């Protein structure tokens, strides 16, 4: 008998303790009637298995290529809209720097420095980019404005790609040898952590994985209730307990349930009280020990949710969580609502952390895998 069915009241939030349905009352046998000739049989239409249709196995190569091209075009348009504020801010500043410029001189580079810093790319990252530009100028590789623009674009892309790392967010399937694949989500309150977990669960589920959510933020009032709304909305089971419960105990129950039901991915919510770093560090360390005892290598990813609107404050949050939580990647939220999207480059350069996902809207599917090339192209085109 499956683990979560052994106790009637245990893991109620999985929604598996449904009442039995009464059998319908027996009816008297109908009276014998004269036989009626059956209608001629019509050939049944050929059915396409659901999995075959979803995976595109019922399509020709040309149809698959057309569908992929349409999806890529849709994603590109949505992403461009999301970073439009950052693009307009950066482009306007850079265009104003280059307007009327006929040659590359110290004054132009100083203005360019101010433009990049204003886009929240950050002082250290801006200095690095300009140093690369100056080397290109000294080598005569950069001798006009267009080559200067191309050099900046290339350097920003190089920074973002250099911080990339593989994980679930790389759109590869979850390794069969790991079950469940544990993703711990951290971040201060108010950055969109709960919303991100809901969207992340929906995305990973839509890729064919069985997902379970662990509501281990038992410190903040109504945290579990808010997560339960997203769990119901996405149809993903949730393990939760009353406020004040030891988060490690909630995680332990969730790990057991995930293994029993054969879940591919377990997404773990955590408390966001960064102001009490010592307690939070001890709590996260305990949770990591619990996860590691149940599944080798768990947690396999620790994603930090950062609000792009906060700009350089988000970079400082990332720096603090990197110390106490062993962050492996970033989810950048509210990218569609800020002109400070340059923070993605600053995080990648100064902390060496990959941007795994980007939140580009309010809808449940508005969480996309962060594509460095798409991001840089959207900023400059």
Question: What positions do the PLM features span?
Answer:
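P-loop/Walker A NTP-binding module and the surrounding RecA-like catalytic core of P-loop NTPases
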Residues: 124-127, 146, 153-381
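Non-catalytic terminal/linker segments enriched in charged/polar, low-complexity residues
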Residues: 1-158, 178
């Amino acid at each position: 008998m499956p683990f979560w069915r052994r106790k009637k009241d245990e893991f109620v939030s999985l929604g598996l303790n449904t009442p039995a349905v009464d059998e319908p009352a027996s009816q008297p046998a109908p009276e014998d009637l004269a036989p009626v000739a059956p209608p001629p049989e019509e050939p049944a239409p050929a059915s396409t298995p659901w999995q075959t249709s979803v995976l595109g196995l019922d399509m020709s190569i040309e149809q698959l290529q057309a569908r992929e091209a349409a999806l890529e075009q849709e994603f590109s348009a949505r992403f461009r809209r999301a970073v439009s504020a950052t693009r307009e801010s950066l482009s306007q500043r850079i265009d104003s720097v280059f307007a009327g410029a006929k040659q590359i001189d110290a004054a132009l580079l100083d203005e360019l420095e101010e433009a990049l810093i204003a886009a929240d790319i950050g002082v250290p990252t801006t200095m690095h980019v300009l140093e690369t530009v100056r080397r290109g100028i000294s080598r005569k590789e950069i001798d006009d404005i267009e080559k200067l623009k191309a050099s900046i674009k290339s350097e920003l892309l190089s920074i973002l790609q250099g911080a990339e790392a593989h994980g679930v967010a790389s759109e590869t399937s979850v390794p069969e040898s790991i079950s469940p694949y544990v993703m711990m989500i951290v971040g201060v309150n108010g950055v969109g952590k709960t919303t991100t977990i809901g969207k992340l669960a929906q995305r990973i589920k839509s890729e064919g994985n069985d997902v379970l959510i662990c509501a281990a933020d038992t410190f903040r009032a109504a945290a579990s209730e808010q997560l339960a709304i997203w769990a119901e909305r996405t149809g993903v089971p949730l393990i939760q307990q009353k406020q004040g419960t030891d988060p490690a105990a909630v995680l332990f129950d969730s790990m057991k349930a995930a293994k029993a039901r054969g879940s591919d991915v377990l997404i773990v919510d955590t408390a966001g009280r960064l102001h009490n770093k010592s307690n939070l560090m001890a709590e996260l360390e305990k949770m990591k020990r619990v996860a590691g005892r149940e599944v080798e290598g768990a947690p396999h990813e620790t994603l930090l949710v950062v609000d792009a609107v906060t700009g350089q404050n988000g970079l400082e949050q990332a720096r603090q969580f990197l110390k106490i939580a062993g962050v492996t990647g970033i989810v950048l939220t509210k990218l569609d609502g800020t002109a400070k999207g340059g923070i993605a480059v600053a995080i990648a350069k100064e902390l060496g952390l990959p941007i795994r996902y980007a939140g580009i809207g309010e809808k449940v599917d508005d969480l996309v895998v962060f594509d460095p090339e798409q991001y840089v192209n959207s900023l400059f085109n």
